């Protein structure tokens, strides 16, 4: 028997879903710069991962740390000129983000695949997420605002699940599950992501998202002289980050840069931070000597996922 969600838990479920949807980039920035101050150990955690990995890194001898770090440096140096540029560091950090996202999805796949048959069904996904199978009528709105919001989110998840299922089998295989969890990483999900965003934000159905639609339900207080700070920030993002052709609206490709989590900015910021801190001769790039001289800083950065890469032979295994 399929059940709807228990009303008592709807509020909590909704909050959790909303938090998960928006927390990625802002959470990374908050952890990196709490109260606006740079946190040095954030870099190591990004490179190494969880505290257990950091502890394991500390156990490595100094020579072994250097050996593995030198191997990583060679891999980052894509043109083999002996220096790490902003672009090389940024590309490496983005690759690291993607690698660990894929690793996490693989771990989740095992947890969701309750009967260990190599696929995750929609029912298994529901059981893992909500401890029961939830099924909503697509055509019947709910009176309660929170319940209706949850229904909409749940139906969107179901549509994404169905889109990820390329072979129309009873469930998702690993590759399809990754597409479901990280549609931004899979080409065949791009059109779905854009369409989903247009359905949510394009209120007049013209195929674009205007500034007004971008800001949602915001209306300026008639007694206020100016917009609040957060609105000014959002307007600036619309104009300078997303509306590339400056036509006052977001086309589908511009919309994609808004709705899909984008690690490029975070990676570029970290690359610039490392060069700024470690570039001893001000040539805007890092030599192996500069990195080894500032080894602790480099191993507390996203470039090595806070040192985590020293324990993952996907990154450090190479001939020196």
Curated annotation (Swiss-Prot):
Pfam family, one: EF-hand_7
Family classification: Belongs to the CREC family.
Tissue expression pattern: Ubiquitous.
Motif Prevents secretion from ER per record, residues: 317-320
Main localization (coarse): endoplasmic reticulum
GO molecular function, one term: calcium ion binding
Positions that bind Ca(2+) 1: 77, 79, 81, 88
GO CC terms in record: endoplasmic reticulum; endoplasmic reticulum lumen
Alphabetical list of InterPro entries matching this protein: EF-hand-dom_pair, EF_Hand_1_Ca_BS, EF_hand_dom
Annotated keywords: Calcium, Endoplasmic reticulum, Metal-binding, Phosphoprotein, Repeat, Signal
Span of the signal peptide: 1-25
Residues annotated to bind Ca(2+) 4: 202, 204, 206, 213
Phosphothreonine, modified sites: 140
Protein name: Reticulocalbin-2
Residues that, per the record, bind Ca(2+) 6: 279, 281, 283, 285, 290
Residues that bind Ca(2+) 3: 167, 176
Chain positions recorded as Ca(2+) 5 binding sites: 243, 245, 247, 249, 254
Database matches in SUPFAM superfamilies: EF-hand
Gene3D superfamilies in the cross-refs: EF-hand
Binding-site residues, Ca(2+) 2: 113, 115, 117, 119, 124
Job of this protein: Not known. Binds calcium.
Location in or out of the cell: Endoplasmic reticulum lumen
PANTHER family reported for this sequence: RETICULOCALBIN (PTHR10827), RETICULOCALBIN-2 (PTHR10827:SF78)
Residue ranges constituting the EF-hand domain according to the UniProt record: 64-99, 100-135, 150-185, 189-224, 230-265, 266-301
Subunit: Binds the snake venom phospholipase complex taipoxin.
């Amino acid at each position: 028997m399929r059940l709807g969600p228990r009303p008592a838990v709807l509020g909590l479920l909704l909050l959790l879903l909303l938090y998960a949807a928006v927390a990625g980039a802002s959470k990374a920035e908050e952890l990196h710069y709490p109260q606006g101050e740079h946190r040095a150990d954030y870099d190591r955690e990004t490179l190494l991962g969880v505290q257990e990995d950091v502890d394991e890194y500390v156990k490595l001898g100094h020579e072994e740390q250097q050996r593995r770090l030198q191997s990583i440096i060679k891999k980052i140096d894509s043109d083999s000129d002996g220096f790490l540029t902003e672009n090389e560091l940024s590309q490496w950090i983005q690759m690291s983000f993607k690698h660990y996202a894929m690793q996490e999805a693989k771990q989740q796949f095992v947890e969701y695949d309750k009967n260990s048959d190599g696929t995750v069904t929609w029912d298994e996904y529901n059981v893992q997420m909500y401890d029961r199978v939830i099924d909503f009528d697509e055509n019947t709105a709910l009176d309660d605002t929170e319940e209706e919001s949850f229904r909409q989110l749940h139906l969107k998840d179901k549509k994404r699940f169905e889109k990820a299922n390329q072979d129309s089998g009873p469930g998702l295989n690993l590759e399809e599950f990754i597409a479901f969890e990280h549609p931004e990483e899979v080409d065949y999900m791009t059109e779905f992501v854009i369409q989903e965003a247009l359905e949510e934000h394009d209120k007049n159905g013209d195929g674009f998202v205007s500034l007004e639609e971008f800001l949602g339900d915001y209306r300026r207080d008639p007694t206020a002289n100016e917009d609040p700070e957060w609105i000014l920030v959002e307007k600036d993002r619309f104009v300078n980050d997303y509306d590339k052709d400056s036509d006052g609206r977001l086309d589908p490709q511009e919309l994609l840069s808004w709705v899909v989590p984008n690690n490029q900015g975070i990676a570029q910021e970290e690359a610039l931070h490392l060069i700024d801190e470690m570039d001893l001769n001000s040539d805007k790039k890092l030599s192996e000597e500069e990195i080894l001289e500032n080894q602790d800083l480099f191993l507390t950065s996203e470039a090595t996922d806070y040192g985590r890469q020293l324990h993952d032979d996907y990154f450090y295994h190479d001939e020196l």
